[in-house]
Design a protein with these regions (language model features):
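Active-site acidic catalytic loop and adjacent metal/ATP-binding pocket
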Residues: 34-46, 50-54, 165-207
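An alpha-helical support segment within catalytic cores of ATP-dependent transferases
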Residues: 9-25, 130-180, 184, 242, ...
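ATP-binding pocket architecture of kinase catalytic cores
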Residues: 31-137
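A general structural signal marking secondary-structure boundaries and capping sites
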Residues: 21, 82, 125-133, 169, ...
Length: 284
């Protein structure tokens, strides 16, 4: 009985989701996809045989430092640059987006050859940096402070771990449009298409590159290859002092740690604990 009740509530939720779409898409059927750590994702199949990608964003974006209006602004610009899949319907207030379907696997499932990845991501960044700079800024110190303030319980080991980083000074000399989550799961195919723009905002490009290095498990040489390829494509360095990405590596670890602690409070599980352990180890 419990299983049937659970299935029934799931079907009701999916029907409610379909009802929020414009009429042409309400007749489709939803098939759940492997969701990200914060989103619910579906394949929407229409009677015509066409498919679309339906994304329902996290219900509490403020807790995670997500600005839906900025996400939508950047997404529209990214479509124009050929970075993001065309969008057929969007409700920025709720994080609902209906996109073209893409059959290409993400880089977790089928990564391009390692030697090509820095150049491909340099291409993503050069096109991304052509967009207008958003008014909403994701500065690492303020962003991490927001996460920390929302923790219901601060681990006893955290103050000593963060003390040195918080006493340092991070670069703050360049602000450009940033995705802030260019991890392998958010890159589709060899183009690549970029998905999940939730953390998009103005940011320091060095933090973007440091985040790429961490989430792709790159060595310094691959990060440096990305930066060199970017300079060649853009016709010069980024900002007055270059990427300065090494200075942002501990900030990537710190923000990743706080994010995982926040998510674990809401939904404890092994995935979040693994992220907590990894980022804590990197900061020690």
């Amino acid at each position: 009985l419990a299983g049937k009740s659970s299935e029934g509530s799931l079907e009701a939720a999916e029907r409610a989701l379909l009802a929020r779409l414009p009429p042409p898409w309400r007749s489709g059927r939803l098939a759940p996809l492997a969701s990200g750590l914060t989103n619910c994702n579906y394949r929407l199949r229409l009677p015509s045989g066409r498919s679309h990608f339906l994304r329902q964003g996290h219900p509490d974006p403020v807790r995670l430092g997500i600005d839906r209006a900025t996400e939508w602004q950047l997404y529209q610009g990214a479509v124009g640059q050929g970075l993001a899949l065309p969008c057929h319907h969007s409700d920025p207030a709720s994080g609902l987006m209906l996109l073209d379907w893409c059959d290409e696997p993400n880089w977790l499932a089928a990564p391009p050859p390692a030697a090509l990845q820095p150049g491909l991501l340099a291409g993503v960044l050069t096109r991304l940096h052509r967009l207008p700079v958003p008014s909403v800024v994701m500065a690492v110190r303020a962003h991490s402070a927001g996460y920390r303030a929302r923790l219901a319980r601060v681990p006893t080991w955290l103050p000593a771990l963060e003390r040195g980083l918080l006493a340092s000074r991070e670069p703050a000399d360049c602000w450009l449009p940033c995705h802030h989550d260019l991890n392998p799961a958010n890159l589709l195919g060899s183009r690549p298409w970029v998905i999940d723009w939730e953390y998009g905002a103005a940011g320091h490009p060095g933090f973007e590159v440091a985040s790429i290095q961490r989430t792709h498990n790159w060595q310094d040489a691959q990060r440096e290859a990305l930066e060199q390829s970017y300079c060649e494509r853009a016709g010069g360095p980024v900002g007055p002092r270059g990427f300065q990405s090494r200075a942002f590596l501990p900030w990537v670890d710190y923000i990743g740690l706080l994010w995982a602690l926040l998510m674990a409070e809401q939904q404890p599980g092994p995935d979040y604990q693994a992220l907590i352990d990894l980022n804590r180890q990197r900061l020690e």
